[in-house]
């Protein structure tokens, strides 16, 4: 067994994902999810060597109790694994302009994450709770923060500055930051390997499609544009997020329809997207089932989702100049051959030609090209953000 193990923590507001990752191979030794924090049925599920386990955490428990359970109840059963953990790696959604790469956590880093909390009010406070819980449970291990926004810090000003008064950026940091950076980094790197090219000479467009979704143009291994903005709300149609809309709709909802700003924020983040259009579900699998059954709302939601995505992909050929591959990843990108086919058909101007057999095969964790050899390459690469976090954690300890 490797001695390069890292405990990776991804703390949400009401959940905590964890995995013990071999930084050399990307294999997980143990992985799991603690969820329903603050509720009576707070629980934890985990998997070891394909075997699944579940336990109650106790009513109204949260991050600290979950980390303590991982240490005492799970790792306590696998002391050989626990002894080889070299670091704790934390996913942090927003690092603003302060953090352009992964860092070892100290008091100044914690203060910086707190400063960025206004840009990610649902995520950064939860990450801080997880960091403090991990520090209490693993006082002797270094803690590393890996930021979703860091990969996008290579974008030029023309891509990240909004057409608002410049002082709003200069004085308040209002700009495009982007998300899913760790995923876009991983799949763009893997795409270069699959193409047999040097990363510095590889131009790809990465579509990370899940309940949250974003597209990134990656030129020579660096992000040059991305669809999410100041927050994850901008860009594509998502599970419950609206993505791009006319900003004046906000004022129409408030002034004409009597919404409060909090209600508008909730509407755009939690009631829109696939759920709002379909009036059925935010789950893409349910949308596809509805589409197959002729459900009008599901059909419209699917068409808008694919159309918006194809438009973004087409526009991102502009900063690249040359496209070596289009890469699909994330839960939807890795598993929905229907959506991939629809998007590629909408991109007919680029001469993508779907290979039905390849497209069917590239699902459920299988990587591969999904187009014929007669035109541009589109491929599926399953993401592995935890591996990137583990690699960064180990590299920072050298």
UniProtKB/Swiss-Prot annotation:
Its cofactor is Mg(2+); Mn(2+). It catalyses: acetate + ATP = acetyl phosphate + ADP. The keyword Cell cycle does not apply. The keyword Nucleotide-binding applies. SUPFAM superfamilies: Actin-like ATPase domain. GO terms for biological process: acetate metabolic process; acetyl-CoA biosynthetic process. Its EC number is 2.7.2.1. InterPro entries: Ac/propionate_kinase, Aliphatic_acid_kin_short-chain, Aliphatic_acid_kinase_CS, ATPase_NBD. It is found in: Cytoplasm. The active site is at residue 148. Keywords: ATP-binding, Cytoplasm, Kinase, Magnesium, Metal-binding, Nucleotide-binding, Transferase. It holds the Pfam family Acetate_kinase. Pathway: Metabolic intermediate biosynthesis; acetyl-CoA biosynthesis; acetyl-CoA from acetate: step 1/2. Mg(2+) binds at residues 10, 385. Substrate binds at residue 91. Mg(2+). Can also accept Mn(2+). GO terms for molecular function: acetate kinase activity; ATP binding; magnesium ion binding. The record marks 180, 241 as: Transition state stabilizer. ATP binds at residues 17, 208-212, 283-285, 331-335. GO terms for cellular component: cytosol. Catalyzes the formation of acetyl phosphate from acetate and ATP. Can also catalyze the reverse reaction. Homodimer. This is Acetate kinase. It comes from Shewanella loihica (strain ATCC BAA-1088 / PV-4). The lineage of its organism: Bacteria, Pseudomonadati, Pseudomonadota, Gammaproteobacteria, Alteromonadales.
């Amino acid at each position: 067994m490797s001695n390069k193990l890292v405990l990776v923590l991804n703390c949400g507001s009401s959940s905590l994902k964890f995995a013990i990752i071999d930084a050399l191979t990307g294999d997980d030794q143990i992985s799991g999810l603690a969820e329903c924090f603050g509720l009576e049925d707070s629980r934890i599920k985990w998997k070891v060597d394909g075997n699944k386990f579940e336990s109650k955490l106790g009513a109204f428990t949260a991050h600290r109790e979950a980390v303590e359970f991982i240490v005492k109840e799970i790792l306590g059963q696998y002391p050989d694994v626990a002894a080889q953990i070299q670091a704790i790696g934390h996913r942090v959604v927003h690092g603003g302009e302060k953090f352009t790469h992964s860092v070892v956590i100290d008091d100044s880093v914690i203060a910086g994450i707190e400063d960025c909390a206004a840009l990610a009010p649902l995520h950064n406070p939860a990450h801080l709770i997880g960091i403090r819980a991990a520090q209490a449970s693993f006082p002797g291990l270094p803690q590393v923060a890996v930021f979703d926004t860091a990969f996008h810090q290579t974008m030029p000003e023309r891509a990240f500055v909004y057409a608002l008064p410049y002082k709003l950026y200069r004085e308040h940091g209002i700009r495009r930051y982007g998300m899913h950076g760790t995923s876009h980094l991983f799949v763009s790197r893997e795409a270069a390997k699959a193409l047999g090219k040097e990363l510095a000479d590889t131009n790809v467009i990465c579509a990370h499609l899940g309940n949250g979704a974003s597209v990134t143009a990656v030129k020579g291994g660096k992000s040059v544009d991305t669809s999410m903005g100041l927050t994850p709300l901008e860009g594509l149609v998502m599970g419950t997020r609206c993505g791009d809309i006319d900003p004046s709709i906000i004022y129409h909802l408030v002034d004409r329809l009597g919404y409060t700003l909090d209600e508008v924020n909730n509407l755009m983040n939690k009631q829109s997207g696939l759920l709002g259009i379909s009036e059925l579900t935010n789950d893409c699998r349910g949308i596809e089932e509805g589409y197959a059954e002729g459900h009008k709302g599901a059909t419209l939601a699917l068409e808008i989702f694919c159309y918006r995505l194809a438009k973004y992909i087409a526009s991102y050929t502009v900063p690249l100049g040359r496209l070596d591959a289009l890469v699909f990843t994330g839960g939807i990108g890795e598993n929905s051959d229907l959506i991939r086919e629809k998007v590629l058909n909408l991109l007919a101007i680029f001469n993508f030609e779907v290979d039905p057999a390849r497209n069917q095969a590239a699902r459920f964790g299988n990587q591969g090209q999904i187009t014929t050899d007669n035109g541009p390459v589109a491929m599926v690469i399953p993401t592995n953000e935890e591996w990137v976090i583990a690699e960064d954690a180990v590299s920072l300890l050298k």
